[in-house]
């Protein structure tokens, strides 16, 4: 399982830990990932995703998982999230 957000694509970054004497040692900046269960209003079921805390805030800001996925670009989404997006768009097209 990779350390990558399924919705925003945030991943591990690398950099330096710099000491007071300006010595640099390699370090990793890990994304703040959480396993979250989100409710899809369109599909009428809950979905379990591993997303960053920042992505969770973005989902709530946009008005839920469905609204977030409809607006999101395909490139940054994981394979699981892409399938969800297609399901939601198909369901919305049927309803319209």
Swiss-Prot record:
Molecular function per GO: structural constituent of ribosome
UniProt name for this protein: Large ribosomal subunit protein bL28
Transmembrane segments: none
Gene Ontology CC terms, in alphabetical order: cytosolic large ribosomal subunit
Lineage, broadest ranks: Bacteria, Pseudomonadati, Pseudomonadota, Alphaproteobacteria, Hyphomicrobiales
Family per similarity comment: Belongs to the bacterial ribosomal protein bL28 family.
GO biological processes: translation
Ribonucleoprotein as UniProt keyword: yes
Domain of life: Bacteria
NCBIfam families: L28 (TIGR00009)
InterPro entries on file: Ribosomal_bL28, Ribosomal_bL28/bL31-like_sf, Ribosomal_bL28_bact-type, Ribosomal_bL28_sf
Alphabetized UniProt keyword annotations: Ribonucleoprotein, Ribosomal protein
């Amino acid at each position: 399982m990779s350390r990558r957000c399924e919705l925003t694509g945030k991943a591990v970054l690398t950099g330096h830990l710099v000491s007071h004497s300006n010595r640099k040692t390699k370090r990793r900046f890990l994304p703040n990932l959480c396993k979250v269960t989100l409710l899809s209003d369109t599909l009428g079921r809950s979905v379990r995703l591993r997303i960053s805390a920042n992505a969770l805030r973005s989902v709530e800001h946009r008005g839920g998982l469905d609204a977030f996925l409809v607006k999101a670009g395909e490139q940054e989404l994981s394979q699981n999230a892409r399938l969800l997006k297609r399901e939601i768009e198909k369901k919305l097209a049927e309803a319209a």
